[in-house]
Swiss-Prot record:
InterPro entries: HABP4_PAIRBP1-bd (IPR006861), STM1-like_N (IPR019084). Phosphorylation by TORC1 upon nutrient replenishment inhibits STM1 and causes its release from dormant ribosomes. This is Suppressor protein STM1. Residues 60-77, 89-104, 111-124 have a biased composition (Basic and acidic residues). The gene is STM1. Ribosome preservation factor that protect a small pool of nontranslating, vacant ribosomes in cells under nutrient starvation conditions. Under nutrient-limiting conditions, cells reduce ribosome biogenesis and degrade ribosomes via autophagy (ribophagy) or proteasomal degradation. To avoid excessive degradation during starvation, STM1 binds to and protects 80S ribosomes from proteasomal degradation. Under nutrient-sufficient conditions, TORC1 phosphorylates and inhibits STM1 to prevent formation of dormant 80S ribosomes. It comes from Saccharomyces cerevisiae (strain ATCC 204508 / S288c).
Amino acid sequence: MSNPFDLLGNDVEDADVVVLPPKEIVKSNTSSKKADVPPPSADPSKARKNRPRPSGNEGAIRDKTAGRRNNRSKDVTDSATTKKSNTRRATDRHSRTGKTDTKKKVNQGWGDDKKELSAEKEAQADAAAEIAEDAAEAEDAGKPKTAQLSLQDYLNQQANNQFNKVPEAKKVELDAERIETAEKEAYVPATKVKNVKSKQLKTKEYLEFDATFVESNTRKNFGDRNNNSRNNFNNRRGGRGARKGNNTANATNSANTVQKNRNIDVSNLPSLA
């Protein structure tokens, strides 16, 4: 069997010929899907420096150095007893303004020595005078005091007492004319006399009449009442021929609209005479 590939020539490879590797052609991906490629590492130089940092509770939560575990891992360099948190100067209560009070201000605020001495001397003198007055009053109180009065002076004193005074009678003037003129005396006389009209009271008028009451007839005539009611009903409707155009009954009844009930007994009605 003949080989048809012999017509193409010698297929033996030449050892001197350099065979180039095939070039891989990569097609550009236009898909919007995320590729399975790890994200690039953050560049700290490109980070925004003016970015506001969280504060408050959010800052405490994001602080990675805070926490009990991190604090326990740190070494305590100084003891809490050796270092004082509040270090103040020995002259903390002293004024550092450099201003001092004058002697006049000191004397006005705390008192002058000379004035204090004079005030003490005056107080001692007042105390000695009060002691002398108290001693004199005690001596006078020790001596008995007797009031001597004569009998006439005692009687006059009792008579002048307000409880022993005799009430004086009221003086009454007996001149009747003088009293009458004093009552009629008027500073401004009336120019016009007003006439007062007296109104008469209205009297009530009573109407008297005798009324007699009699028991009504207990027996009722139902037959007449039924007949009258039927007649009245026929008169109002115009009878059986009213629907057919017979208005003769209505014409006769319209002339006499008031009908007298003859079944009423007049003797049973009360009399107004």
